[in-house]
Amino acid sequence: MAKAELMDYDEAIEMFEPVLGFEVHVELNTRTKMFSDAPNFFGGEPNTNITPVDLGLPGSLPVVNEQAVKHSISLGLALGCEIAPSSRFARKNYFYPDLAKNYQISQFDEPIAFRGSVEVEMPDGRIVTVPIERAHMEEDAGKLTHVGGATGRIQGADHSLVDYNRAGVPLVEIVTDIIYGAEGEAPELAKAYMSTIRDIVVALGISDAKMERGNLRCDANISLSPRGSGKLGTRTETKNVNSLRSVERAIRYEIQRQAAILAAGGTITQETRHWHEDTGRTSAGRPKSDADDYRYFPEPDLLPVQPSAELIEELRVALPESPAIRRRRLKAEWGFTDLEFQDVVNSGLLTELVDTVEAGAAPQAARKWWTGEIARIANARGVDAATLITAEQVASVIELVEAGTLTNRLARDVIEGVIDGEGTAQEVVDARGLAVVSDDGPLIAAIDEALQAQPDVLAKIRDGKVQAAGAVIGAVMKAMRGQADAARVRELVLERAQAS
């Protein structure tokens, strides 16, 4: 769809009310898969972390992963849900190449957790309560790689490759109830909700929640209701959006796209849609199925899950602090102002900041680099900052700045080098020759040359007008290509001016 076919966002909100819903898939970091003893870890050669159970081979039987059940209960409790005294698995039947046995073991009418809510902090600091309908356990499907197309999607691909390493990885799917009232802030609410869910699962320690790896994936449902109609519109489901930035952009795009169609007298097709980060657009996937289409029926090879009241209470007591309480604590510990902390929250980089501080960096320095230079590079490249560089790498750059090895200007070059894969921070410094000059000899030579070239400035400094030294300091820093400590240069400029 061309940009001309998108309605202006503000105009769309005037005409229609956005109605939202989210299905978030959280991959659990258990040692083995949900129903087999195949190892559960990211990466590995394709089709190596598999067993007959994962492939649905005749005679293979599933066994429930106890740790996955405990993780699921913990997540349900953290979402304020009721925990079912008895829940059961069901077969969700559909045919797709990444599902070897042609059904997925999931939960249908008896989920492990239900009726909860989560508090989400909006960019302006307001708290919005998002209703949670349910959280249920299931297994992940395999991964398809489409070869030959320009975008990596199935459209235009020559063929597809299937990797079943991910098949059977334990998941919890968090399903919200219908979300009304988001209005023009629907995209911001989507991003804030995903950021909050990520904070929760990371705090629980049940998932790495790295969206770029698929540990945390969002299916975003959006429909538009004409103002005053009281009727729900036809929804679309944008699948597997894998970054906070993309969630926000995808919701905004769908509102504009659907509004343009409805305003022109068209109808919305109930379908799944794929988000394309490179074009900032969604494209049609397949018709969206209803529950009846999946022909759910109880999984005959698994008994109901019946956690004891003692286990549930044990897991409840072990819950970490809530995201809201954690944020208040971190703000106080780090000494941030309200504005500084809100800037971090709005950027979606709180987890990265926590990890950088834990790696040894000062909180203010970590904030400056993540929300400043790294965010700038991420925006320029159209990606999430968290995908560019690790917290440990950022902490190592900050350490070099604190040690006086780098100036802030030089550190920006080092950050870019690390992001571009040139090595560790120290390796980039060595390879590019970026370290601050610690020998006063070259500095004095550059200072004397600058003073001789600016006799009027020299006279002003001698007359006590030390602010005039700025021109000389600038010339020296330029001559040293920024590889000098500005404070030391200033000190030497004043000394040499009086000695000349």
Curated annotation (Swiss-Prot):
Single annotated GO MF: ATP binding
Please give the catalytic activity noted in the UniProt record. Answer: L-glutamyl-tRNA(Gln) + L-glutamine + ATP + H2O = L-glutaminyl-tRNA(Gln) + L-glutamate + ADP + phosphate + H(+); L-aspartyl-tRNA(Asn) + L-glutamine + ATP + H2O = L-asparaginyl-tRNA(Asn) + L-glutamate + ADP + phosphate + 2 H(+)
Q: Which InterPro entries match?
A: Asn/Gln-tRNA_amidoTrfase_suB/E (IPR017959), Asn/Gln-tRNA_Trfase_suB/E_cat (IPR006075), Asn/Gln_amidotransferase (IPR018027), Asn/Gln_tRNA_amidoTrase-B-like (IPR003789), GatB (IPR004413), GatB_Yqey_C_2 (IPR023168), Gln_synth/guanido_kin_cat_dom (IPR014746)
Query: Which of UniProt's keywords are assigned here?
Result: ATP-binding, Ligase, Nucleotide-binding, Protein biosynthesis
Q: What class of enzyme is it?
A: ligase
Q: Does the entry feature the keyword ATP-binding, yes or no?
A: yes
Classification via NCBIfam families: gatB, PRK05477.1-2, PRK05477.1-3, PRK05477.1-4
Name recorded for this polypeptide: Aspartyl/glutamyl-tRNA(Asn/Gln) amidotransferase subunit B
Species assigned in the record: Clavibacter sepedonicus
Phylogenetic placement of the source organism: Bacteria, Bacillati, Actinomycetota, Actinomycetes, Micrococcales
